[in-house]
């Protein structure tokens, strides 16, 4: 994916490898968001996947939301994010799975309401 060289360059210039091979990118993504840079990533995702039908963009709660939102601007579609906990106001019908957080070195149980992901939709 040569198109994402902008991301590779940003990681090389601003990212830090922490013990356990965890990539720290808090200067532009998960503590402070470099909005113009993330917007450029959104454009790159549109270039990479623009020839495909996309109805929604799915990400996980936290660091993925910024990238997903700015990518969604270029696709003109909504963003759905997997929540790390099902609150009392969440629908009972939901998709659920476990994902590994390498940042926190633990598995998280995540959920998405079935109300927002329908059969036949094309999800990026």
Task: Give residue spans per PLM region.
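Active-site-facing substrate-recognition patch
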Residues: 1-54
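Short, flexible loop segments at the rims of nucleotide/cofactor-binding pockets, characterized by
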Residues: 33-37, 58, 100-105
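Short glycine-rich or small-residue beta-strand-to-loop segments that form or flank ligand, phosphate
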Residues: 58, 123-124
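Short Gly/Thr/Asp-enriched flexible loops that form oxyanion-binding sites at enzyme active sites
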Residues: 66-75
């Amino acid at each position: 994916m040569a198109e994402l060289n902008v991301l590779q360059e940003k990681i090389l210039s601003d990212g830090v490898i922490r013990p356990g091979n965890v990539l720290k990118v808090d200067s532009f993504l998960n503590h402070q968001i470099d909005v113009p840079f993330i917007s450029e990533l959104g454009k790159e995702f549109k270039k990479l996947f623009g020839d495909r039908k996309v109805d929604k963009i799915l990400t996980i709660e936290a660091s993925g939301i910024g990238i997903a939102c700015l990518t969604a601007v270029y696709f003109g579609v909504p963003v759905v994010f997997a929540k790390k906990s099902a609150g009392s106001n969440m629908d009972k019908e939901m998709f659920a799975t476990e994902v590994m957080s390498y940042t926190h070195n633990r598995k998280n149980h995540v959920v998405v309401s079935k109300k927002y992901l329908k059969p036949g939709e094309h999800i990026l």
